[in-house]
Amino acid sequence: MAQDLVRILLATVLSCAVVAAGPLAPAQQPAASSSGVEQTTWTSPAVQSGHPWMPVLRWAQQEQAMIDGNVRDYSATIVSRERIGDKLEEYQSIFVKVRHRPLSIYVYVLTPESHKGEEAIYVEGRNDEKLLGHTTGIAGRVVGTVALDPQGSTAMNGHLHPITELGIRHLCQRLIALGNNDVQFAESQVRFLSGLKLNDRRCTGVEVIHPVPRTNFQFHRLRLFVDEQLKLPVRYEQYDWPRQPGGPPELVEEYNFMNVQINNGFTDADFDPRNPRYGFP
């Protein structure tokens, strides 16, 4: 089934070309809310069945099933940037090891240089569900390894998502959640993209656009790249609506998965702070 996943994306270009060319007609004129963000009406089941999102949603569901059945673990370099408040942060890069069952994550910070060498480990069902992490330099030697709530303010400082939501599988989960929401409403535009590249690797992609800001939608535009050889999502971009009419959309978050190596045979030792290859104090 894994070999068919990218074909599903490409095949839907023909089957959905007419639908994807423009938004669905809303059932009635949207009403403006007091916040200035408009609201639209719920679409009928008949509209949902022909919704531009449906091929993407079906693909994401199949992709998640493929990952669950065939990808036990992987390593990757993730290059990302996020908008925290009104500020778009600089790119940062991390090396990660991820095991899906039980969910186990090891993170080593590569950049920025001021944080290089920081490490974090999370293992589902262990360490009281806490993230284990350490900083570097004098503070790292003095404080040592700390246990943090993954969703607490300290661990979340400077991040949009907790460590428990890191990874390729979560990109599928997010796409499914967004799609399940959006198929209830009209005005989604979907385009399928080919000839893309990430780190010199050929990719296929999909782009979803909501032209008008409405309370029902969580984004203005998103783009997802799928590595044609790995058959895995490797890039995700999400944008908010322009602040001024005619202005550029605002990047909210971007994640690039590079040098992905799957099924490495990771063991508990790869997610143990006592591993002698790691730098936990």
Task: Describe the function of each predicted region.
Residues P30, G85, L110-S114, L132, ...:
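Gly/Pro-enriched, hydrophobic low-complexity segments
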Residues M1-V6:
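N-terminal secretory signal peptides that target proteins for export/translocation
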Residues C16, N70-Y74, D182:
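Short secondary-structure junctions and interdomain/linker hinges
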Residues G36-Q48:
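Acidic/histidine-rich, surface-exposed loop or edge segments in extracytoplasmic proteins
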Residues A20-A32:
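Signal peptide processing junction and immediate N-terminal pro/mature segment
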Residues P52-G140:
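N-terminal mature ectodomain segment of secretory-pathway/periplasmic proteins
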Residues I8-A20:
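Bacterial N-terminal signal peptides
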Residues C16, S34-G36:
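Compositionally biased regions
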